[in-house]
Amino acid sequence: MTSDSTNSMSAATPSGRLLITGAAGALGRVLRKAWAQEINGNGRWQHLRVSDRLPLHDLGAHEEQVICDLSDREAMEGLLQGVEAVVHMGGQAVETHFEIIRDANIQGVFNLYEAARLAGCKRVVMASSNHVTGCYEQGQFVSPDMPAKPDGYYGVSKLFAEGMASMYFERYGIETVNLRLGSVIPKAEDRRGLSTWLSYPDFVRLTLAALTAKDVGCLTVYGVSANPNKWWSEAGWDKIGYQALDSAEIWRDEIQDKVFPAGSLMAQKQGGSFLGLGPFPKSV
């Protein structure tokens, strides 16, 4: 089952400047489209700052573009000036060489939070990942309060981001909702996806809920649709007012036989294909 995303941002929202990092990426584009529909229909989020390493060529009238590399601390401080809230979708999105992940996801997250502190920004919605717990066995039910079991450098970098979020809340009052996102793609592609899929409309609903909920402190939630066989807890959804509406079940007959090689870590662990990546050569 899938839902229409047209009305997925209908909750009351503030009118201040919002920043989306990683605006040129797949998830950034989904959010920008949703915000554009919201502005056209209801006049909300009139000022949207969008950022990526490369220029965007499809800017809306409501969008202000700032080209910025997450690893550039000074540039990040400029990027956050005047920003009330951040939806952080930027960074390295898949498992790869540690050095690449270090610069984008570790140095980049430090730069983001330090810039937010200096700018007085008080809310971050962080794209964390299910790969923070990707070494749990497939089928095991996992909640945010269980020990981390990252499945690679990427998962470790997202665990680092969650740690930074906690520290910057406890010391400086910057609230964060860490979204341990599942498989955010147009449709589930394999048997794993029957448990991990997060539809685009549910992703938009989740992000908006995390952005607008009051008094979240530092909260970690899993981002997944209403899949009957999902592996992850709904803990924290009630705190932000998120309800998943879509389900991967509509593709079960088509994809349930699409599995990873028997006996491989990809078939055993929740991280799936990420368990088949690496080790990587020393030079990059």
Feature-to-residue mapping (PLM):
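N-terminal Rossmann NAD(P)H-binding glycine-rich loop of SDR-like oxidoreductase domains
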Residues: 15-41
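Glycine-rich NAD(P)-binding loop of the Rossmann-fold in SDR/ketoreductase-type enzymes
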Residues: 71, 100-111, 119, 148, ...
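NAD(P)H-binding glycine-rich loop region in Rossmannoid oxidoreductase-like domains
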Residues: 57, 63-104
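Conserved Rossmann-fold NAD(P)-dependent oxidoreductase catalytic core, especially the SDR/UDP-sugar
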Residues: 111-149
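Catalytic helix-loop patch of NAD(P)-dependent Rossmann-fold dehydrogenases
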Residues: 103, 137-176
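Alpha-helical substrate-binding/gating segment
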Residues: 181-187, 197-218, 226
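Conserved C-terminal active-site "lid" loop/helix of NAD(P)H-dependent oxidoreductases
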Residues: 57, 220, 226-243, 247, ...
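Conserved glycine-rich Rossmann-like NAD(P)H-binding loop of the short-chain dehydrogenase/reductase
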Residues: 40-57
